[in-house]
Amino acid sequence: MNKWKKILMIEYNRLPDIFKNLKSKGLYYSLESGMFDWQFNGVYVFHLSCRGTTVYACYREWDIGPDEKCPVTNVGYFNDIRSEDDLYKIVDYKINFYSECLKEFKKRKIEVKKQELNKDFEAT
């Protein structure tokens, strides 16, 4: 069993502190089917999994329709993850990236809402 899968199988209360600290960033995860699933304020963000020697992140685009498939992105190779620090760097980078995506998405939604309200106002 490789190191990645071992990390995935560690029980919640024995997980490294950095994973427990994700809650302070407004994110949380669940251990399900050997994957870490992150959600941001209740919105599914992405999960990390390992197939062979490649680490993948499967994530939802903020504005995709319900019929669109969840895109899968290669976020690194297992051979490049020589320590837990390497794993944390990948995770931390992804969390920051998706946090920014969510902020942008909310901003866009607010802009669209304002435009709709303006149209309604002009029509009356």
Model-derived regions, located:
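N-terminal Sec-dependent export signals
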Residues: 1, 95, 101-111
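Negatively charged, low-complexity tracts enriched in Asp/Glu with abundant Ser/Thr
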Residues: 1-40
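Residue-level detector of alpha-helical secondary structure
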Residues: 5, 12, 16-23, 88, ...
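Generic alpha-helical secondary structure signal
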Residues: 16, 23, 32-33, 40, ...
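Intrinsic disorder/low-structure terminal segments
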Residues: 18, 27-28, 35, 39, ...
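Intrinsically disordered, low-complexity regulatory segments enriched in Ser/Thr/Pro
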Residues: 37-97
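Short acidic, low-complexity intrinsically disordered linear motifs used
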Residues: 104-124
